[in-house]
Curated annotation (Swiss-Prot):
It comes from Mus musculus (Mouse). The chain crosses the membrane at residues 36-56, 69-89, 151-168, 173-193, 199-223, 258-278, 288-308. Disruption phenotype: Mice lacking Taar3 show decreased sensitivity to isoamylamine. Mice lacking Taar2, Taar3, Taar4, Taar5, Taar6, Taar7a, Taar7b, Taar7d, Taar7e, Taar7f, Taar8a, Taar8b, Taar8c and Taar9 show no visible phenotype or behavioral deficits. They however show an absence of aversion to low concentrations of amines such as 2-phenylethylamine, isopentylamine, N-methylpiperidine and cadaverine. One of its GO terms (biological process) is sensory perception of chemical stimulus. It is a multi-pass membrane protein. This is Trace amine-associated receptor 3. It is found in: Cell membrane. The keyword Chaperone does not apply.
Length: 343
């Protein structure tokens, strides 16, 4: 999600001429290093999430409610890497927007939409894991295909309506005279918020769902510990039978992994959303380099997700081998066993 630094003194703005770019003080070497680093993050984001999308879509063994939510979230991360990050990279390195005002509004709207969509997906995944671990007897009747479809529709539609409605109406910059002058003078494109909408965005779109996720995973952790303790107290000859009803090890492991995904998300996006909340009350005095770093820290979350899957999910590594080796193109490859340890 884009942020903006608005200088207090805009009297020097006209000397650049209307819709010009202020000169950058970054050397060629610094710009090349920035391009290399950002391009690397972008490539990992695009291809890593593409592997997740292909794997869950192709292999029937991965067709589960949780994985369909993960597939949709990977699509969000893929779009961020493919559509948003390239243009943000040029803007961050060159300190200028070369792509026009109309595309600027689309870019800002789509950027915010994807950020919020990720949050909503994580909330949905947390709910799914809650029922799987804490109420397994009712999981299959609660998290049905129709329920997953409704969750996915909400995860995409609500952020889209909110983001595009807010940016296109320009309600987020209402009353910000400095912003209007800056846009008139420079080839400039960044998403910023006045005090009202900055507070609304942080409270309703980050703090509230973030608190819900933390609460749900806290409950999952407590229940998992209780199950593990109960299993350890069982006689050896009854552990196997009781374990199937008391707790599913795979579900607990999945909940733990997705909890790590949630933790990384909060760590990456919390500083950015705090800037959205606080910067308007500081008269937008946060240096532009700091805001750029916060934005790219948020983007980096989409880079981390496939790396987390690769580290914690054996099926991801197995599916990657199928894709890289070309075995995925063989007949009946969609029925391949990605969990050999389960047999």
């Amino acid at each position: 999600m884009d942020l903006i630094y608005i200088p207090e003194d805009l009297s020097s703005c006209p000397k650049f001429g209307n819709k010009s770019c202020p000169p950058t003080n970054r050397s060629f070497r610094v710009r090349m290093i920035m391009y290399l680093f950002m391009t690397g993050a972008m490539v990992i984001t695009i291809f890593g999430n593409l592997v997740i999308i292909i794997s869950i879509s192709h292999f029937k063994q991965l067709h589960s409610p949780t994985n369909f939510l993960i597939l949709s979230m990977a699509t969000t991360d893929f779009l961020l890497g493919f559509v948003i990050m390239p243009y943000s990279m040029v803007r961050s390195v060159e300190s200028c927007w070369y792509f026009g005002d109309s595309f600027c509004k689309f870019h800002a709207s789509f950027d915010m939409m994807l950020s919020l969509t990720s949050i909503f997906h994580l909330c949905s995944i947390a709910i799914d894991r809650f029922y799987a671990v804490c109420d397994p007897l009712h999981y299959t009747t609660t998290m049905t295909v129709s329920m997953i479809k409704r969750l996915l529709a909400f995860c995409w539609a609500a952020p889209a309506l909110f983001s595009f409605g807010l940016v296109l109406s320009e309600a987020n910059v209402s009353g910000m005279q400095s912003y209007e002058i800056l846009v008139a003078c420079f080839n400039f494109c960044a998403l910023t918020f006045n005090k009202f909408w900055g507070t609304i965005l942080f409270t309703t779109c980050f703090f509230t769902p973030g608190s819900i996720m933390v609460g749900i995973y806290g409950k999952i952790f407590i229940v998992s510990r209780r199950h593990a303790r109960a299993l350890s107290d069982m006689p050896a000859n009854t552990k196997g039978a009781v374990g199937k009803n008391l707790s599913k090890k795979k579900d607990r492991k999945a909940a733990k992994t997705l909890g790590i995904v949630m933790g990384v998300f909060l760590a990456c996006w919390l500083p950015c959303f705090l800037a959205v909340l606080i910067d308007p009350y500081l008269d937008y005095s946060t240096p532009i380099i700091v805001l750029d770093l916060l934005v790219w820290l948020g983007y980096f979350n989409s880079t981390c997700n496939p790396l987390i899957h690769g580290f914690f999910y054996p099926w991801f590594r197995k599916a990657l081998q199928f894709i890289v080796s070309g075995k995925i193109f063989r007949s009946n490859s969609d029925t391949a066993n990605l969990f050999p340890e389960a047999h």
